[in-house]
């Protein structure tokens, strides 16, 4: 095959990448919402928040999105979705196979790819390779007001490097089972009054509903979604059924949208 490829030298490659990257960081250093974790609940939240017109930034410590979706069920590449979560997947064009009334099997790769694409197309910004290791807080009134971030590679190398800060009107902990952001806030800002009982063992039927019901605000400016909810509220886990994860993301997005529009503090 004969093809004429545009020639681009190394200096231009570097300049364009640096310039465009810095412009993104400059724009999103003040965000409406920062979501920590690009798993199913984080991506679902990002999709609905961005659709609502909020400046939404997602930090993911790994170099890929999807969180627990990619691992499927013990590395099997299929997952379960149940009603009414199927409506969200249909909205982002994920194909579902109904195996009994109201119960569906989905392909894990398609699920995470299309959910992430939907969030990006709605306007959310996803940045990989960044770890959130602390929060910003303010007093009068006491609230969480953003996050401190560092390159994941820097932390893995155990280098002593200070973070940079990202302001946000709302921070969503979508980090999964350990609720890492809320755990840091609970430990370092005891005035917030956050008590974390820890996640219980599996009870799928109850866990799905309880996770969605308990999704939302943990402290002013700080919210829990997905498996972080089970950790913070002492709820059972559910395994490779993901309906509650995407429903939790939608629920937290709706709550934040109402809170920010009500207080009229959007960026």
Swiss-Prot record:
Q: Which GO terms describe its biological process?
A: thiamine biosynthetic process; thiamine diphosphate biosynthetic process; thiazole biosynthetic process
PANTHER family from the entry?
THIAMINE THIAZOLE SYNTHASE
- Substrates-to-products reaction catalysed: hydrogen sulfide + glycine + NAD(+) = ADP-5-ethyl-4-methylthiazole-2-carboxylate + nicotinamide + 3 H2O + H(+)
Kindly list the GO molecular function terms attached to this UniProt entry: iron ion binding; pentosyltransferase activity
- Which EC number(s) does the record attach to this protein? 2.4.2.59
Q: How does it assemble?
A: Homooctamer; tetramer of dimers.
Q: Does the keyword Transferase apply?
A: yes
Q: Which residues bind NAD(+)?
A: 41, 60-61, 68, 132, 160-162, 227
Supply the HAMAP family for this chain: Thi4
| Source species of the chain | Saccharolobus islandicus (strain L.S.2.15 / Lassen #1)
Q: Which Pfam families match?
A: Thi4
Q: Which residues bind Fe cation?
A: 162, 177
Cofactors, names only: Fe(2+)
By its UniProt entry, which InterPro entries does this protein fall under? FAD/NAD-bd_sf, Thi4_fam, Thi4_prok
Protein's recorded name: Thiamine thiazole synthase
What pathway does this protein act in? Cofactor biosynthesis; thiamine diphosphate biosynthesis
């Amino acid at each position: 095959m004969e093809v004429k490829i545009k020639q681009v030298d190394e200096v231009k490659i570097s300049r364009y990448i640096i310039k465009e990257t810095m412009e993104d960081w400059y724009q999103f250093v003040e965000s409406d919402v920062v979501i920590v974790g690009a798993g199913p609940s984080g991506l679902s939240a990002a999709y609905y928040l961005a659709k609502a017109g909020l400046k939404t930034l997602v930090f993911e410590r790994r170099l890929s999105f999807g969180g627990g979706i990619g691992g499927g069920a013990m590395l099997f590449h299929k997952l379960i979705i149940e009603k009414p979560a199927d409506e969200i997947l249909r909205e982002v064009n994920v194909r579902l196979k109904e195996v009994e009334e109201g119960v569906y099997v989905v392909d894990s790769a398609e699920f995470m790819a299309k959910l992430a694409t939907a969030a990006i197309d709605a306007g959310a910004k996803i940045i990989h390779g960044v770890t959130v290791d602390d929060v910003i807080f303010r007093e009068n009134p006491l609230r969480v007001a953003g996050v401190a971030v560092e390159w994941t590679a820097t932390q893995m190398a155990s280098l002593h490097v200070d973070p940079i800060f990202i302001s946000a009107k709302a921070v969503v902990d979508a980090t999964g089972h350990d609720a890492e952001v809320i755990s840091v806030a609970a430990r370092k800002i005891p005035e917030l009054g956050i008590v974390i009982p820890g996640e219980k063992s599996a009870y799928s039927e109850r866990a799905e509903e309880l996770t969605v019901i308990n999704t939302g605000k943990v402290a002013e400016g700080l919210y829990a979604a997905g498996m972080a909810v089970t950790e913070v509220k002492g709820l059972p886990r559910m395994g490779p059924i993901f309906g509650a994860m995407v429903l939790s993301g939608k629920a937290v997005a709706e709550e934040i949208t109402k809170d920010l529009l009500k207080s009229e503090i959007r960026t």
